[in-house]
From Swiss-Prot:
This is Killer cell lectin-like receptor subfamily B member 1B allele A. A motif (ITIM motif) lies at residues 5-10. Keywords: Disulfide bond, Lectin, Membrane, Receptor, Signal-anchor, Transmembrane, Transmembrane helix. A motif (LCK-binding motif) lies at residues 31-34. Residues 101-211 form the C-type lectin domain. It comes from Rattus norvegicus (Rat). The gene is Klrb1b.
Amino acid sequence: MDTAVVYADLHLARTGEPKREPPPSLSPDTCQCPRWHRLALKLGCACLILLVLSVIGLGVLVLTLLQKPLIQNSPADVQENRTKTTDSPAKLKCPKDWHSHQDKCFHVSQTSITWKGSLADCGGKGATLLLVQDQEELRFLRNLTKRISSSFWIGLSYTLSDEKWKWINGSTLNSDALNITGDTEKDSCASVSQDKVLSESCDSDNIWICQKELKRESTCNDS
């Protein structure tokens, strides 16, 4: 009987003690949140850097494409272009002993003959007797012959049938542009001195000037 009482008291005493609750444990989510935040921040920064680099690369690519020609030259075209750049351009050239001025070549004779003789001589050279184009050309030719005392024949003569001065190409003289001094007879031809255009006999002897167009010659090197 006593033993049972003692056991009951002990049991009550133990069961009457307050229970100590274990400290609350942190959930796994609570511990991992800061790490996820850091990871997300790193990933965001990495993505931003990649985006910036992609934009820069795309800009460089677009700029490169804009600078390229739409049609690329073939190797044959490139070689042809190189050949053209190494060749000398075509230039205008007068024959030896001829003088160039604007688009003409002029040859001054060293002897004196009649007007018809000078006409024939120029024809033999593949040229024509001088046809004065304008006053500027006339000044050039006078300067070219200023050391020669004789006047020079030009391709202008008086035709009795028309009673007009005509050039050898058939055109009529414009008297406002060129004034002829001297008597006009049935056999009159025009010559030029340093200060006048003279009417004189076609059988007189004068030097003469032939003219021809400048000849275009290519100076490309053959290889």
